[in-house]
């Protein structure tokens, strides 16, 4: 993932770090190139504009441009703003004070929601937590069958509706049943649609009102690019989401969805990324590691360390003069 954007940013960074003196025009040129690179990566314009504005405000000025290592300082600023754009520090899904913790999975049909529900269950099981998977997509018998197969493979209990066909009641009954057992986490696999519609949102709203999940996670295909962020915004405005899981990241060479979602949804973080079809192919979304990978790993991190060291030396010199 991010291959194309990584190549473009690497070239821009080499230009910046190779100049001993930077002018406002040099920073503006770099920002124009970054803008083009992000557009080509299918990043949403509503995410690009504030990002570039923040970088320019911090990267242009006497303090940075007259520092010992202006190019390195600007690289560090871009790095920090990219981390912020991606949502900052990863926060693990917490458990509720009392059992069970209820997680609602929402998203469009075909995003990989059912498989992702299984991946989450495996993640919790590996940490010693008992899970209950709830097949609430009554419109697709294949989804119910798939979740039962996943539960069998993981040796995780799957709730059996026993003839109930109302998805709201299925979720309510499942949570009630889990409350009488030592179930730590209940994962609700709700219905999807091929596109956003009022009926889907109304059903999800009712489930949320009746069940009161502790986490509502939106699952979306990363291959959709910036459109994934727009759909996430629609779901957030309609039902309120707490975070996003991006699937099929192993096939997304551009990374537009990952770079757009936090900004477009008003701060809803990408929590996890799916990197394959196997049930262990779910990774926490660490923004700093993603940016490190995006910007050339060790090379950029060494630049940032140099910039921080240079800044510390300058501050020390100023302090010594005052003394």
Language model features with spans:
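Primarily NTPase-proximal linker/entry elements flanking Walker-type ATP/GTP-binding cores
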Residues: 8-136, 143-163, 170-190
